Every structure is written in structure tokens, then in C-alpha cells.
């Protein structure tokens, strides 16, 4: 998986035990700040040029999903984790796909310079990093640490929650952990 690698229709490449990371880029952000483009540049992801190129059965990270990502989804992770790179201001343009497993990330804080400290406004690389940890692929997630200078701060801000989410048995337990955490910070 090098720079410029592009997925063909329905293809997902698993290297060893690694989860394929797939980017669908709507080219809406500043290319110099775009974490999706950096993931592609550093060989951390492959690009799906069209929605048709997104592998069937893959996990699509979606803010509109009805289920939270959990370790139980690791079976779908083998088909890939897909991040749709578009700006939060254009979130209504988020595509709805069939034949994929839409999952929402649980409560996490952004650590990137644009949205630092904002809950649930992660950039594409933060979303993938969190997904890999929740799905039990810590070693693969470590590959992101040296490529994004905010990554250690992301782990500092969210480490305990990520560990709790990664130890949950299913989506409902992830949601319970999330809700307990949110209740604890409200009081």
C-alpha cells in the first residue's frame, strides 16, 4: 500500500492481521491540512475513488449510524474500515450506502488543532485511530502515532475511554460506557 494506491471495485487488501483502511475523499478540505490525504501519502490507507469501490461488508464510519462501533465488529473490519472525508459543515452530504456496516464512533474528544477538545468532531485520522483501537488493532494504530503530531494528545485525552470501549463486548455496552462517562462529566 503505497502512495496513490487506489481500490478497485469491491477490493479490500488485508496485510497480515491488519485491517484495510479505506478513504473516500470528497476533496472539501485544505489539502495541506487534510489527514485523509496524509494517510494515503504515508501508505496508511487506500483510496476509493468512487462509492462503488467501497468493499461490501466493510465498516463505514458514519455520524448517522444507529449502532456504535465495538470489538464485536472486528469480523467486518477484515473487509475494511472506511472513512468518508468531508467537512463537518457539509455533513448533510454524507452518502448512505447499502451492503456496508455503518457504525458511529462513541464519545471522544478531538485533539487536532482545528477542533481541539470538541467532542465528536474528529478528523479522518483520529476516527481511524480510534476505530483501530476499539477493534483491537493497537499495533496497527501505533503506525499512526509517528505520522500525526497530535496523536499522542489524542491518546492522552481519550486513552481511558478507548480502553473501556475496546473491552466492551458489543455496541450496547459501548453505548452504556459512553453514557456513564457523559453522566460523570455533567455532575
Language-model-detected regions and their locations in the chain:
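Short, extreme N-terminal leader segments that mark the start of a protein/domain
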Residues: 1-46
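Extended aliphatic helical segments
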Residues: 6, 14, 19-23, 60, ...
